[in-house]
Structures are given as C-alpha cells and as structure tokens.
Amino acid sequence: MPDHAHSAIARRLKRANGHLETIVEMIEHGRPCAQIAQQLQAVESAIESAKKALIHDHLSHSLERSFKLSGAKGQAALRDFRAIAKYL
C-alpha cells in the first residue's frame, strides 16, 4: 500500500492524464496551436512536479533511515539536505 505522499503523486498524475486526454481531443478538433501548446505546458509542469515530489520523498525516506543511525550529527545533515534539496 503506497504511503500518503505516493497517493498524492498518483492523484496528481491521474489529473495530468485526464488533462492530456483533453489535449488529444483539442488536437483532433483542430483547436489553435497556441491553446494546445499552453495546455501541454501545464501537463508537462504537472508531470515534472510529480517527478520531483517522488524523488524528494524517496531521498528523504532513504536518508532518514540512514541518518537515524548517526545520531544528532546525522539528523543535522538530513536537515541540511532537505533545505538544499528543495532547489533541485
């Protein structure tokens, strides 16, 4: 069973998938390219956001398990990592 973060990521990707299906319909109905490109950008951003969330969650959990063994120094390193990782 996926954890809360993975459930949220799955929901985000399902929304992006639905949005992508709508874009296919836009193309099939001859909608203007500028509108299609705008919608594609939105889907691309949603997928990129989901990817980042998944990677951050995985790294955070993996490092948390590793650093728990390192005591206070490890916890400080984990906090530093989390602070900088948001800029990835």
Model feature map: region roles:
Residues 1-88:
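Solvent-exposed interaction patches of small proteins and small membrane subunits
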